[in-house]
């Protein structure tokens, strides 16, 4: 493999055996591509804003005399960039401007004569923009729009599986689901009549809808039934014979023709009989007259002489009717062909229960069902029915819906109209009847071919369309109302409804979620999440077991492991690593094409529907060097089942072993050795890991770490290759390579790093450079690490030396014993940043004021505030300290005589304001790291605000001028090159000031042109600098746009350093979680023969029952990796020659490595080898990909290479006594995470506090400063111990005995430790409730 200079710093040894045919795709593309489709100009008008505009415009007036047409749209530039939006608490959005054309037609002139055209650009509100990382900044917070998995539009055939009716009869139904519009359901009832429902309302006989479509009874029967023709010849009844129809029936009479008996009476008719009848070409047979009785006629029969109706279509024939028909000259009678087997009489039966008999009555019936209580008129009924399924404004199947609809009905074309046609409705009914007749299957609703993904772009477009439709109504009114000659398009459009619809979606939709920003993995996973909940989706309560379960079609599309535990299990899923959506929104996954038994590198993406037609081999099938399968029988999947196929039957092969799982699960090494339940916990807990102070790469990884770190966007990645020209903590400057420059630019890339910013979860976001001056970098190299990344790899936790052994009960029930060394070395120390805001409002009694002059507060409390009343940066504060002094005016109150006296003596006037300062919440302490002051436009800024403003201006100017200097330097080096090549002497040139270089003239015309071009660039650069500086200055000095009634907002940022302590939750990556029970002194920890103590002691009993053996393998492999690191470290300390070092490292990389993925150190320079060795000192990082990991033998080999016992167990000694433990203990390195469930956030105690209003019991929970619930079972415990007085105290004075509480307080103050329990308030509530039932209950005094 070829490595860039940066990648050579540390190479992960890969145990993967399968070649990487397809690189891991960009992990956020599902979000970015979808939103890109929404906002980019689409000339076809298929999707995005363009489609929304075209679907609503042109808007015509009611009279048709004028219309408003849509021409085009453009998105402006956002006012603030992403960081400014986050600081100011505003939405990162761009203004949408739409060019509209108002066309007014002449009234009297012929149609289409234009009187006037007015074109104008109209502002239509703001559209939130997506940041580069796939998030939205809404009101200053980062949010993610989660993709939704919903039922695809189309037609679905289903059954109730016999659950509806008591008899257990299976009832079939069909449902036509449009993208928008009314649902149409057809269903059978237990009597086998077919009914229809519209929008799940009450059911009507299905033939009503056919009558509404203008079909007569005859036509309806003609559509759904084959005919049996009887002829009366010579007073005998003959039947036209189609032999195939007789199969399986029992003959009720001798079937004979031409004197030959084919089937005797009472015999079952078999295929042999039918073959004979066909062979002899029998067309008619004579039947007894009784045979026709009970048959149903297919059309009306009229006596032609009198015009009298003898029998109507769908009537049952009787012998009397037959006689009548014969008399009136009808010799040929057509009846419906039905049987019990596969031609049921369902429609014929349904026509009988249908109360309507013509189109009008059917329309009226539908109108009554849809609008009960309204009197139907013909016009209203017709327009209602027309609008239900046949109007493009009200009904749309969408391209997906039409495709699914036509495929389901086995039609050839997959495109068509978005509305229903007569044929559509009839074909659905026909297919439903076929299924009832036993032909065809019902659909599997959980098949991923029937569920599609709706991503950000599509949902935003739908919301936008909703807004436009609201505007459309208003525009129609305006066009009809008034004087069109003076009106312009912008007078017609009110942007409010559009803004409101978009704002509502991004701000408060169920699928617009507060981004989970614990660490880079949680960000990526959140953006790749797929939810079945949300508008138009399922609800938790209604979702059954089937929907939540893993389905065979999830393979390679949706992860079978990563899903929440709890009520949402299976409803919220995660996208698999390689999955993507196709044009219709269905998930597809890549496969390698197999041609004639040879696996090629050609890649096809298949959706769940297409996949069903192929045989697909697993990724771990063994291939030879030409790509042939080694085994004759290959394990494959076909139609959702796994079985063995011969190698020439195989069509496709999986791309990668990690194709099945999601990003989160693909980060668990040895996942294949973990039980699925624990793997689920492991994948979920990685997302809760808090970024530690110093990130530490996992010794045992899976090779996915780099992809996650880079794609998450927390690292700074080089856009173009070049050389590092300048680097400090907050900025990296790259001089771009010549071949990657755009013509006529300075060739300098500047990366500003994020420093100590707060994330959504209050963790700390901080970027640190990982390149040094003069290093070459290539495009895609990581320049700076973000939170939880180490040299461009995801690093969620720390590598800890663990031992599996019991230790004095301190690891009972998954508790974890931790060494003090872990605390000393700050291995799990995390920084948390909290934002506290103080808002100064304009109240009825006057404005609130931010000031240091606060009534009744001592000097000590004000010591950390400046003269404006705002805390200093760098101040260390604890719970209760004032951060921002604020006073609120209060109304004049009646003064007590004492207060009057005091005021008379001291002239104190401060009592008309009350203290409403911002204080540090209880239990929080930390350091103030930043203060932001926002002042409303037109309100005078205080001193602190001006200081901050001045500081920001200085910083902005410094940043920009440094940027200018860097760019100037780059430009002048190019000017110098031109001048020198044009004949100017270098020495003389260097003596001349740089500004004068551009005054020189060159004789070579081409060089002179180049020089003039560069001079122009220089002027442009300076002009650009002035412009940028001015813009920055305007932004900084401009007042802020605050909510109505708010004068000022002060935001204070507190940084808290949290060390690990008992009560914190930790976990490995295999679902092995626990709580720290004790921090043990280093000298008491078990140690090995070299005197090295372990860091963590885990309980061995946590492994067997949970079946997550991956943790043990990880521990062994981690030990081997560390052992190799130790040997490299020893070699470096002894300063052995590079050749030896190179040879040893090469041996380690070659061990168990596949030929295709060899690391060749011979291409590395000595310096590069030394630097690699330096980075391998703490252990050689290892990748063991999911389902393709290290084998047991390979781990043993690696342990041997690191001079460690191959059992992975060593002898330990007790740190307290020095005695040897009685058997060897498994010791190794496991990657441990500290989860965001910290004891500091959960610890809580209360003496007195707030009480609930009705029951007068203390509130619950830390947020309400509540008490501990002493529940039913606790009461039983005290009863069992006979602790009556304690129990009385718990139920009265410590809970809801109001008088007793007050008395007790007084007694304690007086030093009298007595209590007088009274009546608990909740008993009084009970009395009141009983009285409200009309039962008078009184307490009698003894």
From Swiss-Prot:
Catalyzed reactions: RNA(n) + a ribonucleoside 5'-triphosphate = RNA(n+1) + diphosphate
Domain of life: Bacteria
Entry annotated with the keyword Endoplasmic reticulum: no
UniProt GO cellular component terms: DNA-directed RNA polymerase complex
The entry's keywords: DNA-directed RNA polymerase, Nucleotidyltransferase, Transcription, Transferase
Enzyme class: transferase
EC number(s) from the headed UniProt entry: 2.7.7.6
InterPro entries noted in UniProt: DNA-dir_RNA_pol_bsu_ext_1_sf, DNA-dir_RNA_pol_bsu_external_1, DNA-dir_RNA_pol_su2, DNA-dir_RNAP_su2_dom, DNA-dir_RNAP_su2_hyb_sf, RNA_pol_bsu_bac, RNA_pol_bsu_CS, RNA_pol_bsu_protrusion
HAMAP family: RNApol_bact_RpoB
Function: DNA-dependent RNA polymerase catalyzes the transcription of DNA into RNA using the four ribonucleoside triphosphates as substrates.
Subunit structure as annotated in this protein's UniProt entry: The RNAP catalytic core consists of 2 alpha, 1 beta, 1 beta' and 1 omega subunit. When a sigma factor is associated with the core the holoenzyme is formed, which can initiate transcription.
Protein name: DNA-directed RNA polymerase subunit beta
Naturally occurring in which organism (per UniProt): Salmonella gallinarum (strain 287/91 / NCTC 13346)
